Design a protein with these regions (language model features):
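P-loop/Walker-type NTP enzyme "switch/lid" segment
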Residues: 1-17, 122-124
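Conserved active-site and cofactor/substrate-binding residues in soluble primary-metabolism enzymes
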Residues: 3, 89, 136-139
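Conserved catalytic-core segment of NTP-binding enzymes
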Residues: 7, 17, 21, 26-110, ...
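Alpha-helical scaffold segments in soluble metabolic enzymes
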Residues: 10-17, 117, 143, 147
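Phosphate/oxyanion-binding loops and surfaces in catalytic or ligand/nucleic-acid-binding neighborhoods
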Residues: 97, 101, 115, 151
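Beta-strand-loop-alpha "switch" segments that mediate conformational coupling across diverse proteins
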Residues: 102-129, 141
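NTP-binding/hydrolysis catalytic cores, primarily Walker-type P-loop NTPases
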Residues: 123-164
Length: 164
């Protein structure tokens, strides 16, 4: 319920030491619970693939965020990319579609390679990034982490995490 979600968000105000970052992973689509947590966050990152269903889900989420919560800044990560160039093409296509109808700012954050190493890390529940590896997966995640800070903050006027 809305009250339960509000209590969860406000419970973070009581932490003695505030975290520098907190990632909140919500399900695809514009469900009420997802929207409440997104509106309570400073920065929003949407993960897409090159598939039409992914574009539809992401567009729906961004449209609801924009129209109902006045959020207009979004970082975009392209998952399962066959190459950095293909990821950028997918982003450009999604941005073109989205900005045709919505006045939103989409920032390309980067891509997650479609690789066996990523799939194996998911199956084994082990990190794909290691300080000793200099592979395409590590490079991609390092790029993502450096660009996350560049996403513009949303000012929604709703309750926020760590809002005391």
């Amino acid at each position: 319920s809305d009250l339960e979600r509000h209590k969860i968000i406000k419970s973070f105000d009581d932490l003695k030491k505030k975290p520098e970052f907190m990632l909140i992973d919500v399900g695809a689509g514009a469900e009420s619970s997802s929207m409440t947590f997104m509106a309570s966050s400073d920065k929003i990152v949407v993960v897409i693939t090159g598939e039409p269903t992914s574009f539809i889900d992401a567009y729906s989420l961004i449209k609801t965020s924009y129209l109902d919560y006045k959020m207009n800044n979004f970082g975009i990560i392209v998952n399962m990319a066959s190459s950095p160039m293909q990821a950028k093409l997918n982003f450009d296509k999604f941005q073109s579609i989205t900005q045709k109808f919505l006045d939103v700012n989409l920032k390309y954050v980067g891509q997650i390679p479609n690789s066996q190493k990523v799939r194996n890390s998911i199956i084994s529940r082990q990190a794909v990034v290691s300080s000793t590896n200099n592979n395409i997966e590590t490079k991609a995640f390092n790029e993502l982490s450096s660009k996350l800070l560049l996403i513009e903050t949303n000012k929604t006027g709703t309750i926020k995490f760590f809002d005391n």
